[in-house]
């Protein structure tokens, strides 16, 4: 047991990322049942849909689970009230100022974890009173920080800057990766891509199969004038790159992006015109597995990595 498992009430310090269009109740409950912490991704749900997923997750697992809430959510007050009404005990927040909601949530007995992309924001989280931070590096899928700091560099920087329990994210998908994060100063890991491609993920099977075929360099961080987003190669990404190369304004990029592209790509499986989001670690994932298989593999490969001798001294 360490500070993360103690805080979250889990067997393992492994958290499933609350990804849009992937992280419904089936995925979250499966991860929690396997010893990790499952997160429902509120970012792609209407309030009533979120309530339904929370109730179904409660029925599917007796273990802790949480909800990931982007603070930029337009119906944020309604979402927060639903979380309280439905008895959710753990909330991960992102994409906003942690001071806005942390106190309100903690007054209602909820554990609060905030996602950051820099040591500067980690210190702000400590000032805000969060219970732990997720430090997410450049390798992660979806929306990224503007700093473009890799996980390998970010974790020790955040560890030095704050005493908060630290969860590493971005580019982690193996037991060896978990061990590396721990050595760098993390006490837990948040894994998105590996779980997004499992059987229980609500993402389109077409999207999953395409992502399982990706190699190094097939994702790229774009849309930096809006919100930096790691996108998979397809016709839409080519259009974004062309627009950015020609000096498109923020407004022109918003028009190109339109509405519903992430749903079209990730949930509906439109591989050409959809916004396909996945992390760099997809390059080393080639099989679709169940959550139980992934968790068993992560834990076993972590244990094997710990037992190896890495000494270079004679």
What is the predicted role of each segment?
Residues 1-161, 165:
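Active-site entrance/lid segments in N-terminal catalytic domains of soluble metabolic enzymes
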Residues 19, 171-172:
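Active-site metal-binding loops of divalent metal-dependent hydrolases
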Residues 115, 170-171:
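Conserved acidic functional residues
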Residues 145-167, 173-314:
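Conserved active-site-proximal phosphate/metal-binding subdomains
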């Amino acid at each position: 047991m360490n500070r993360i498992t103690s805080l979250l009430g889990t067997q393992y310090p492994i958290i499933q990322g609350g990804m849009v269009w992937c992280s419904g109740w089936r995925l979250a409950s499966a991860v929690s049942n396997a010893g990790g912490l499952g997160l429902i991704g509120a970012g792609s749900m209407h309030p009533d849909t979120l309530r339904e997923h929370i109730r179904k997750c409660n029925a599917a697992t007796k273990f802790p689970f949480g909800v990931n809430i982007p603070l930029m959510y337009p119906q944020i007050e309604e979402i927060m009230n639903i979380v309280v009404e439905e008895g959710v005990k753990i909330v991960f927040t992102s994409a906003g100022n942690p001071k806005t909601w942390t106190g309100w949530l903690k007054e209602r007995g909820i554990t609060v974890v905030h996602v950051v992309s820099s040591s500067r924001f980690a210190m702000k989280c400590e000032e805000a009173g969060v219970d732990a931070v997720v430090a997410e590096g450049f390798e992660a899928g979806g929306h990224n920080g503007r700093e473009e700091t890799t996980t390998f560099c970010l974790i020790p920087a955040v560890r030095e800057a704050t005493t908060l329990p630290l969860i590493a994210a971005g580019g982690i998908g193996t037991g060896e990766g978990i061990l590396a994060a721990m050595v760098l100063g993390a006490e837990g890991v948040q894994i998105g891509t590996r779980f997004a491609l499992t059987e229980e993920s609500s993402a389109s099977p077409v999207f999953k199969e395409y992502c399982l075929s990706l190699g190094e360099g097939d994702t790229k961080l774009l849309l930096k004038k809006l919100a930096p987003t790691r996108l998979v190669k397809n016709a839409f990404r080519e259009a974004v790159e062309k627009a950015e190369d020609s000096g498109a304004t923020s407004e022109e990029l918003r028009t190109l992006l339109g509405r519903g592209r992430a749903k079209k790509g990730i949930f509906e499986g439109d591989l050409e015109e959809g916004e396909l989001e996945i992390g760099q670690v997809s390059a080393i994932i080639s099989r679709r597995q169940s959550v139980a298989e992934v968790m068993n593999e992560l834990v076993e490969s972590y244990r094997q990595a710990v037992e190896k001798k890495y000494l270079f001294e004679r």
